[in-house]
Swiss-Prot record:
It comes from Rhizobium etli (strain ATCC 51251 / DSM 11541 / JCM 21823 / NBRC 15573 / CFN 42). Keywords: Cytoplasm, Ribosome biogenesis. Required for maturation of 30S ribosomal subunits. CDD domains: YlxS_C. This is Ribosome maturation factor RimP. It is found in: Cytoplasm.
Length: 198
């Protein structure tokens, strides 16, 4: 999947209510800057806090990127004025134990542990935890690490039933996330070098 495909890929898990209105305001700005929205949440911390999670199309996000995103969306939010009280704007990367919101997240992080929740019962459950062993256009196969008596070890979860999903922090995940970040930075540096030579 290319970066162009990534920026056009819709999120499986989206917000509702005010959070949805905020996402509708913020997402076009992010896409125009080469970023993808992961999640928007209004929290009642330290007064009110708007938490925006984003990443570049290649999956990276630096402190400078967070600052750039904050400076770009702040004036748009001031003009749209969707919140009727003072709030703090907090922009961050999704982190290593990130929310999984797109189909490509399940492909990219195949082999890693995830905990997820579904909107409907699948095999008498709505909550699952296990390793992503396969992902396709319709859903993903989870190999559970905690199987109750009489349950199958593997379960297929359709994307249409998914209501929440998040990676579980493990040593393998940290290693692979650092490796992916290093590779993305090297590719960006090579691209910048090629652009400078033109």
């Amino acid at each position: 999947m290319t970066n162009a495909d990534n920026e056009l890929e819709p999120r499986l898990i989206t917000e509702t209510g005010l959070d949805q209105r905020l996402a509708d305001i913020i997402e076009p700005v992010l896409v125009g800057m080469g970023f993808r929205l992961i999640r928007v949440r209004m929290l009642n911390q330290n007064g009110a806090t708007m938490q925006v999670m984003a990443e570049r199309n290649d999956g990276t996000m630096t402190v400078q990127d967070c600052e750039e995103v904050s400076m770009a969306i702040s004036p748009v939010l001031d003009v749209e004025d969707p919140i009727d009280k003072e709030y703090h704007l907090e922009v961050s990367s999704p982190g290593i134990d990130r929310p999984m919101v797109r189909k490509s997240d399940f492909v990219r992080w195949q082999g890693h542990l995830v905990k997820c929740e579904t909107s409907i019962m699948i095999g008498n459950r709505k909550r699952f935890r296990g390793k992503i062993v396969e992902a396709d256009a319709d859903g993903f196969t989870l190999e559970r690490d905690q199987v109750a008596y009489g349950e199958e070890q593997k379960v297929i979860i359709p994307f249409t039933a998914l209501s929440d999903a998040k990676l579980i922090l493990t040593d393998d995940l940290i290693r692979d996330a650092l490796r992916a970040d290093k590779l993305a930075k090297a590719q960006a540096a090579n691209q910048n070098e090629a652009d400078d030579q033109e």
